[in-house]
């Protein structure tokens, strides 16, 4: 259910703007998207897990805020990111 260390390192490597970059909006959105996708799969089996659903909504909100920030700062990076992650917007 959680992201493995290898998967997290791969996402950071794929979306980092420079070596060692873990705080850029692209990396944060990629990690949140991975966690959101994992929780979405979890809810297919555990429909009544409302405690985790609240966490999912918080993650979606956080991702939305980061995407809005990135769109405001650099539209080209925003477009590239949503294309790479397959986020519909």
Curated annotation (Swiss-Prot):
Record Gene3D superfamilies: 6.10.250.3130, S15/NS1, RNA-binding (1.10.287.10)
Single GO biological process annotation from the record: translation
Pfam families: Ribosomal_S15 (PF00312)
Cross-referenced SMART domains: Ribosomal_S15 (SM01387)
Keywords for the protein's UniProt record, in alphabetical order: Ribonucleoprotein, Ribosomal protein, RNA-binding, rRNA-binding
InterPro entries the record matches: Ribosomal_uS15, Ribosomal_uS15_bac-type, uS15_NS1_RNA-bd_sf
A GO-annotated cellular component: cytosolic small ribosomal subunit
GO molecular function, one term: rRNA binding
Function, in words: One of the primary rRNA binding proteins, it binds directly to 16S rRNA where it helps nucleate assembly of the platform of the 30S subunit by binding and bridging several RNA helices of the 16S rRNA.
Family the entry assigns: Belongs to the universal ribosomal protein uS15 family.
The protein's assembly and partners: Part of the 30S ribosomal subunit. Forms a bridge to the 50S subunit in the 70S ribosome, contacting the 23S rRNA.
Protein's name according to its UniProt entry: Small ribosomal subunit protein uS15
Originating species: Sinorhizobium fredii (strain NBRC 101917 / NGR234)
């Amino acid at each position: 259910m959680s992201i493995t260390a290898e998967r997290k390192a791969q996402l950071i490597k794929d979306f980092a703007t420079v070596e060692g970059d873990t705080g850029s909006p692209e990396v944060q959105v990629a990690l949140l998207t991975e966690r959101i996708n994992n929780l979405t799969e979890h809810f297919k089996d555990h429909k009544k897990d409302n405690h985790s659903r609240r966490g999912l909504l918080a993650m979606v909100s956080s991702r939305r805020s980061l995407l809005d920030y990135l769109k405001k700062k650099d539209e080209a990076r925003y477009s590239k990111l949503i294309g790479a992650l397959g986020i519909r917007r």
